Structures are given as structure tokens and as C-alpha cells.
Regions:
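A conditional alpha-helix N-cap/helix-loop micro-motif detector
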Residues: 122-126, 250
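Conserved alpha/beta catalytic core and glycan-binding cleft of carbohydrate-active enzymes
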Residues: 29, 183-274
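Structured alpha-helical segments in the cores of large, soluble enzyme domains
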Residues: 125-138
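A conserved hydrophobic secondary-structure block that centers on an alpha-helix together
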Residues: 135-147
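Acidic/aromatic-lined carbohydrate-recognition and catalytic surfaces
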Residues: 1-107, 139, 149-222
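The substrate-binding groove and active-site-proximal loops of carbohydrate-active enzymes
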Residues: 114-123, 146-151
């Protein structure tokens, strides 16, 4: 998403909107966006970007500094039309990055708005997006794969099964953070994890536990000086952090869930979902 001109699928989507051949490859809530996909790429409000000339029409494209966006067919400016009028005719809405935490309408990789999710849960999209990977194995270029965060997928089990079939059961490891005592699910078609749990064990070998007392004392002094509350029990820290994420950088996703549930899009519903 960060460089639409380098991604033919995304470029076609921005050009043709819902009518794009590749529209089904991306998970976009078109209705919430008023029929447009919202792109949080601006450093200011769009009116200010237009007023300063940072946003401009350049041939058959909209330009914002180094960012390029296609104009929809038939949407080029006529005489005396300003850039905001042209922008209003596009299948995308350029908006300030400050809105990304609560106003996005496309699925992304966790809180990284520059990485739009591809709907690999759809067999046709999987086949189209993994053809090159299949060729690597057919040509003997690679022997295995690392899959980043499969839990971020809509259907991780089915995805790994398709990947296993595509690669003829090649060596595949997944980036999955396991809790202490947790094991990789047996139903994952994978040979193991990327090793974070092993790294945690190695860390314990290399770190002197006698330093804990000194670090705890330093933490207490800093909390007293800064006015921070006393240390909370670890489960409370985890629960509070998860809630902060749901109410912060992933609020767009929480709002999407409330809409998918058919529930009111208000603070009370968001709180219940989080």
C-alpha cells in the first residue's frame, strides 16, 4: 500500500474501485468508506495539503510528495477544477495518518497501515498470490519458508495446509510467540516456530538473576519520582496493555468488528468488544 505504483493489484484497485479485477483480493469495508478505500498517507488534513500545493494533479495521477495515485477513468480535471474536486471523484480517500487508528476501512497487518492484507483465505486469491512461490519450489530455488505471524490471518490452519500442498510438504516454520508452557498446535501444517521460545531460554542463561533486586529498586525510585503508580501484578499489566492496544492503534479493527456484528458503532459497544 505504501507504494501503489509498485503493486499492480493495488494500483488497479485504486483506479477502478469495486469494479477492479483485484477488488476481491483485498478485505475492504466499502460501505463504511462511502464506496472508497481510505488511505492514511497525508501529514495534514487534505484541505491543507491542497492549499499548500503538496497535493496536486500530475497528468493522469494525483501526487503527494513522492506518493503517486491513479486517476479513475474519466475523472481528469476539466478547466478551472481544483485538486479537491478531482480527489472527490476517486475510488480512494486520502486522509491524515492521525485517522488511521480509528477510521480505516481495509484489513491490514496488525497496526501497520502500509501493509494491506491479502485475502489468502480465498482459494483463488491464494493461487494468484502464491504462484511465484510455487515456481521457486518447482525450480528448486528454495527448500523452505518462514511464515510471519500466521495468527494474523483469517484462516491460519487452512492457509498452512494449502501452503504445505503447494510446496510438497517442504520445511516450513512459523513466527508465533508461544506463552510459557504453550506448544505449537499439532494441527498447524508446520515444522516448528522461528525459535522465540528458545531465545527466551537462552536469555535466561545469559542474564544474571542477581540483577533483579537492583533493577526492581531502580524501577521503584523512578516510579516515585515520576508519579507513576506502583508496579501491578503481571496479569493486570497484560490485560491493561491488551486493552490499550484495542482502544488505541487497533481501534479501527475493533470498530470493524462492531459493524460486522451489526451492533451500534458507539463507545459502549467498542468497550464490550475490547
Amino acid at each position: 500500500m505504501a507504494h501503489p505504483d509498485e503493486n499492480p493489484w493495488w494500483w488497479d484497485l485504486l483506479t477502478h474501485g469495486r469494479a477492479s479485477h483485484w477488488a476481491a483480493a483485498f478485505d475492504i469495508d466499502w460501505d463504511f468508506g462511502g464506496g472508497r478505500v481510505r488511505l492514511p498517507v497525508l501529514g495534514e488534513d487534505i484541505e491543507q495539503a491542497a492549499a499548500t500545493g503538496a497535493l496536486r494533479v500530475d497528468g493522469d495521477e494525483l501526487r503527494y510528495y513522492e506518493h503517486r495515485f491513479p486517476l479513475a477513468p474519466g475523472s481528469a480535471p476539466s478547466a478551472h477544477e481544483d485538486v479537491l474536486t478531482v480527489h472527490a471523484r476517486q475510488h480512494y480517500e486520502l486522509m491524515s495518518w492521525r485517522r488511521e487508528a480509528y477510521d480505516l476501512n481495509y484489513r491490514r497487518f496488525f497496526g501497520v497501515s502500509s501493509l494491506a492484507a491479502v485475502r489468502v483465505e480465498d482459494p483463488a486469491v491464494f493461487e494468484a498470490s502464491h504462484g511465484e512461490i510455487g515456481r521457486w519450489f518447482a525450480d528448486g530455488i528454495v527448500d523452505g519458508l518462514r511464515v510471519d505471524h500466521p495468527d494474523g490471518l483469517q484462516a491460519p490452519v487452512e492457509y498452512l495446509e494449502r501452503l504445505d500442498a503447494l510446496t510438497a510438504s517442504a520445511y516450513i516454520v512459523v513466527e508465533k510467540i508461544l506463552e510459557h508452557g504453550e506448544s505449537l498446535p499439532q494441527f498447524f501444517a508446520a515444522d516448528g516456530t522461528t525459535g522465540y521460545e528458545v531465545l527466551a531460554t537462552i536469555d535466561r542463561v545469559l542474564i544474571d538473576p542477581d540483577g533483579e533486586v537492583e533493577l526492581d529498586a531502580l524501577d521503584a525510585r523512578l516510579r516515585e519520582r515520576s508519579g507513576l503508580p506502583a508496579t501491578r501484578p503481571w496479569p493486570e499489566v497484560i490485560a491493561g496493555t491488551k486493552r490499550a492496544i484495542g482502544e488505541g492503534i487497533l481501534r479501527s479493527e475493533v470498530r470493524r468488528l462492531t459493524r460486522d456484528l451489526g451492533a451500534p458503532d458507539d463507545a459502549a459497544t467498542e468497550d464490550a468488544v475490547v
